[in-house]
């Protein structure tokens, strides 16, 4: 049985367990070495989404473009 790759939404739901930016950065650092390049691109997209949520202290389905200026 082959595993199907996780989607951005799958990664985002897992990353929502991270309650602080520090924890999120630790998870990103760990996954940097464990995921393939294709999986990493999807993971980084979800991680950026979660970083925006943590920075604004709100959950978003889609991040408004105005929020990105607050993300480092």
UniProtKB/Swiss-Prot annotation:
SUPFAM superfamilies reported for this sequence: Hemolysin expression modulating protein HHA (SSF68989)
Swiss-Prot/TrEMBL induction comment: Expression is autoregulated. Induced during biofilm formation.
Matching Pfam families: HHA
Domain of life assignment: Bacteria
NCBIfam families given in the database record: PRK10945.1
Domain notes: Histidine-tagging (His-tagging) at the N-terminus does not impair interaction with H-NS, whereas His-tagging at the C-terminus does impair interaction.
UniProt-recorded name of the protein: Hemolysin expression-modulating protein Hha
Designated gene of the protein: hha
